[in-house]
Amino acid sequence: MVNYKDLGLVNTKEMFAKAIKGGYAIPAFNFNNMEQMQAIIKAAVETKSPVILQVSKGARQYANATLLRYMAQGAVEYAKELGCPNPQIVLHLDHGDTFETCKSCIDSGFSSVMIDGSHLPYEENIALTKKVVEYAHQFDVTVEGELGVLAGVEDEVSSDHHTYTNPEEVIDFATRTGCDSLAISIGTSHGAYKFTPEQCTIDPVTGKMVPPPLAFDVLDAVMEKLPGFPIVLHGSSSVPQEEVETINKFGGALKAAIGIPEAVSYTHLTLPTTSRV
């Protein structure tokens, strides 16, 4: 058993509490190799931002659990080397689909895990999420649950349709599972290729394809039901800036999960950006 605190990592509890108070979101980047991790940490230090390093089950299998653990520890030391004396870095399992996967990550030094039971019937999702929470909280590891299904493909996670989160279920789900944050579905999409042409409309002025609009009414209703509770939006890497501003008006998303396509280089990752979730 390796405790994440021995690696210099933190969980999301204090990080999210500060974000709620400060009115900002925490970026969560999926990474698959050393170059991506270097770029993420460099950008986080330069912008003085806490950051969540996300790893899918497939990426963990590819990297090797032991090597990945030391990469995360190395990320903390790299941030210090770059001038950040107290790095706020989370190592998070993205879309864990079984209790066994989540337990394995917790036992090997992850500070946060996601259990995605959104494909299950509601009561089964609650039971699975609660089981993970009960184990994780013994070691002060935070847990993200999910209600609703995102379309798109990301590693083993795939769906050809959206199922928006039902706002009437969020209080019951959060209360009964004890999860620390909740991923919801409002129309964002997994993967590098977000929408098919059939899902888009054509802008009559520019002639460009426009993706389907996000369901801000769902976000608004969820925020009303769970004020001050950490809310997560997955598939956020291609949300336009004007949509980000609208999300912020509704109270923002406390965690924005951002995937990095394999073709994106270190140079591109470290270019200046004006986008802020």
PLM features: what roles do these ranges have?
Residues 50-99:
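Active-site cofactor/substrate anionic-group-binding motifs, chiefly glycine-
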Residues 26-29, 51-53, 89-93, 113-115, ...:
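Hydrophobic faces of well-ordered beta-strands that scaffold small-molecule active sites
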Residues 100-104, 240-247, 265:
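Catalytic cores of alpha/beta
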